[in-house]
Amino acid sequence: SSAASDVYKRQEGHVQYAFMTIREIERFYSQYYPRWDARAYYGLMELLAVAPGQRIARMSCGQRSQVALGLILAQNADLMILDDFSMGLDPGYRRLFVEYLRDYARSRGTTVFLTSHIIQDMEKLIDDCIVMDYGRILVQMPAGDLLGRFRSYELAIAEGAALPEAPEFHRPTAIGGRAEFYSFETEAEVAARLRQAGIACDTLRSEALNLEDAFIGLTGKY
């Protein structure tokens, strides 16, 4: 029906018309969304330093992607679904949008469901974290706790020696006299466990992880 068609138009995505300018495409889409908020769109355009009269056809792929995302934000929806939103964005534009999206969602109370293959993008957006491996939950905790507690460890060991088998040591490897593993234990706790197994830990060192490193440490590199 016509009524149903109108509802779908308000909830579906958009088509980008390259012959339009920044201002023209905003005016065009504003007709179809009753909760349209042009400020959300133009706020992002100002950060991109693009003029309202600039034609989309003359913009880079990254800028065009940001225009598309700005049009989505302007719809002022209660729920936004962004599937692989970072495709086509270089690191600078990606970070700009992530920070803009974070502030947008917090100020409006908007629910945002998003997917991304770039895990570090999530660090600025999430409060709680669930890491799964083939349907099995490995970790469920606040993201700050995961990044604050889970660390990588490295030390020199005798050729042919092996780390002790312990559930506290995640993804242990020993190659060429170097051992690496991940753990939620503190450096003092790890050192005590190694000494108990008869392994010298004078060369033991630990390193804090970002979210991507933590994910690899929990699930494996491949």
What spans do the regions from the language model cover?
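Short loop immediately C-terminal to the Walker-B catalytic DE motif
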Residues: 86-87, 119
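Helix N-cap at the start of a conserved alpha-helix in ABC-type nucleotide-binding domains
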Residues: 91-93
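ABC-family P-loop ATPase nucleotide-binding domains
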Residues: 11-67
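Short, small-residue-biased leader/transition segments that mark boundaries at the very start
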Residues: 1-8
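C-terminal coupling/interaction segments
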Residues: 183-222
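Catalytic Walker B motif of ABC-type/P-loop ATPase nucleotide-binding domains
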Residues: 80-84
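ABC transporter nucleotide-binding domain
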Residues: 96-185
